[in-house]
Structures are given as structure tokens and as C-alpha cells.
Amino acid sequence: NYVTINDVANMVLACGASPIMSDEPTDIEEITSICQGLNINMGMLNPRKIESMQKAGKKSNELHHKVLLDPVGAGSSSFRTEAALNLIRDIQFDVIRGNISEIKTLAAGHGTTSGVDADEADTLTEQNLEKMIPFIKDFSRRTGSVIAVTGGIDLVSDAKRCFVIRNGRPEMGRITGTGCQLSGMMTAFLAANPENNLEAAAAAVCAMGLAGETGWKYMQPG
């Protein structure tokens, strides 16, 4: 995602990992082979990038490397939705991380959103939390992936267990790329904890929220 690529690279470095960004089909399999984790981000999508995503994802599966999907904008166009669904069909993802609108689109196989942000009607609240948890667990069961739904309240779930995470700051949603940064961080956490996908994903979400809270404190006068 060219919009957020520099911020994501710096976030991965801050986690102690070493980022390399590539979307070229010619060398993507070679690049993927030297990495322990793959973060497929669907921002700035085009057919050439889809080809690279497919090649990189399949190579990572072959090598038993960690793979994360960030389905940016799924539901905002049929092109994006179809591309995301094809990726889920063809590649085994360790984690799928998105906002609630993107995840609902992928779980249902169709949907509409107003862009890369979650629709207001889809907002995860204390009132609909009990209904959403079984929905997310079922999507995890069907995909074999940990599902991370991020927003005001975060859910990180496999088919059996679900972490509900309430931290962070609402102001984080006003910064472009915080979700992309989290996906980069989460991929690093997965690569460092290969036997614990659920816990690694939840730890990344917690760390991002705590970082936001700490940053907010430093921004206050006095």
C-alpha cells in the first residue's frame, strides 16, 4: 500500500523485525522465500499486485511461513471484494485483520462500504458484542484463520476463543494508516511466535492500543 508503506516499514522496524516491501511478480517468490512472515495489504490494488499476492501467498504456504491478509476496502467495489475472496480461497492465512465492515463483507461473500473505513452502521458496540462474537468465531472456523476485527472495540478470535480488547484512543482512527501499521506489527509478532497465532495477534492489538494511549498522554499540555 503506497499510501502507508513508509509508516508500516518504520512500525515493523520498531518491533525489532526487518521489513522488505515488494509487489513485483518477477521476484516476489524469491523475496518471499527469505522472509518469515508475509503481510498482504490490498491498498492501492491492481491486477499486477493481485498476481504478486497470489504468488507470494502460495509460496509462503509452501514454506510454512506466516501469512496475514489486510483486505483494505473489501466491500467498497466488486473488484476488491472478488480479489479478497479469491485470496482467501487460494491461500491459507494465519490471520485476517480488518475493520468490521471488511470482515462482514468477506464472511458474507458480498457487501458495500463507503471506503476503507468501517461503516457507521457496522460499528461494534457493547450492545451487539454478544451477537458478533459467534459470527466471528464461525468465520474463523470456515477459513481456518484467526480473525482480528479492529475498531473502537477489538475482537481477536479463532474458532473456540475470542479476546475482547478495550484500549487505545478514538483519535487513532483519525490517522491514515494505523490499521496498516497494525497489520505490519501483527505479522512480525506472528513470525516471532509461530505456534501461537491467536495470542500473537491479540498481543499486537494490545500493544498498538497501549502505544496510542501513551502517545496521547505525551500530547497533553503540562
Locate each region found by the language model.
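Conserved N-terminal subdomain of the carbohydrate kinase-like
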Residues: 1-69
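Short, small-residue-enriched loops and turns at beta-alpha junctions
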Residues: 45-48, 73-77, 155, 172
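Glycine/small-residue-rich loop that forms an oxyanion/phosphate-binding "nest" at active or ligand-binding sites
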Residues: 49-98
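Acidic, glycine-rich active-site loops and adjacent beta-strand->loop/helix elements
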Residues: 72-76, 102, 153-154, 206-211
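Conserved phosphate/ATP/ADP-binding segment of small-molecule kinases
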Residues: 80-162
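Short pre-catalytic strand/loop immediately N-terminal to key active-site residues, enriched for Gly-Thr
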Residues: 163-177
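Conserved post-catalytic alpha-helical subdomain immediately downstream of the catalytic base
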Residues: 176, 185-222
